[in-house]
Amino acid sequence: MTTQPARQRTILRDISSRAWEHPADRGALVALRKLKGFDAVLKAVSGLFNERAVRLVFLGSAVRADEHQFPTLHRLLGEVAETLDAPDLPHLPELYVAANPVPGAQTLGINEPFIVLTSGLVDLLDDEELRFVVGHELGHAISGHAVYQTLLQRLIRLSGVTAFIPIGGLGVRAIVAALHEWSRKSELSADRAGLLATQDPATAFRVHMKLASGGRLEDLDTTAFLAQGREYLEAGDLRDSVLKLLLIENQTHPFAVVRAAELRRWVDSGEYTRILSGDRPSRSADDDATVSEAAREAARSYSETFAQSQDAVGRLAHDLAGFLGSAKGWLDETFRRRGA
């Protein structure tokens, strides 16, 4: 953890979490909530989860950041909360550093989420890169992701022990698969929150480069790394596309090169700049946002992704959608003429 010179950042007054939430994240959550038995599983697992006990585990085994311990992380949390104009939470999430050489971070909890960074991550990143990570995790907390992340972790640990859940093991596996899909999309949302917190795309890309390589920035190149991400997303035939789907089936996070490429795509779309300039969803208008709007945005997002994709499955989905749309138009016109 090293110190970088201070820089000015735009305070994002009244920003809604909708500003950084990836449409596919919201759409996956809408689909998840529609799954048969989801409410029963959520209720059952929530009853098994003792938030106080989990917090006590970290209180007893890790180090809580405050003015005296990891003061830089404590300061970063306060600054990130100010930048993201954190809404009226009861209090900021507690932040813990746990002894673990593997770089990682997570936000846990149901009613009072808290953040855990591993010592390996703190050692790997400089202060500005840690600002991105803290913003990423606070974004999870503000978006309400911690509830579903906690649910996924508990279900994974309970895999094979599902007789107590009314819908049975098969239904639970479907929910776990849907949670994995949502989790990967939620990471794209949180990356956007992290970028809005640091307001420096180069810093965000460096984090993913370090996570992929273990460090050694002198041997890395941002342009080449982003090109690598594009190659992974776009290259290959149908076999590679299927393999990529299988590779991430049980992953909670997209690969680092994919996350960097997706963040680059968001910056290039102009949306990031519009948010900084004031053209963004406001928290005060959240009550007017509807679930159907989230579903429509998700559908539009997937459609645009397929249209732009060079991946075999993406091209197939886009072409199939176009064919079905044309067929529907032809059938509609045929029936209209017959009825005339």
Regions from the language model: what does each represent?
Residues 1-111, 273-340:
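Hydrophobic or amphipathic, alpha-helical segments that drive membrane association/targeting
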Residues 66-68, 116-132, 178-184:
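Short pre-active-site segment immediately N-terminal to the catalytic Zn-binding motif
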Residues 68-74, 80-88, 167-234:
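Short helix/loop segments within enzyme catalytic domains
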Residues 77, 117, 136, 190, ...:
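Divalent metal-coordination and catalytic microenvironments
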Residues 125, 134-143, 189, 193:
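Active-site His/Glu-centered metal-binding helix of metallohydrolases
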Residues 138-157:
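Catalytic Zn2+-binding segment of zinc metalloproteases
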Residues 156-172:
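Short hydrophobic membrane-inserting alpha-helices and related fusion/pore-forming segments
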Residues 209-244, 249, 262-294:
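Extracytoplasmic and endomembrane cell-envelope/extracellular-matrix remodeling and assembly machinery
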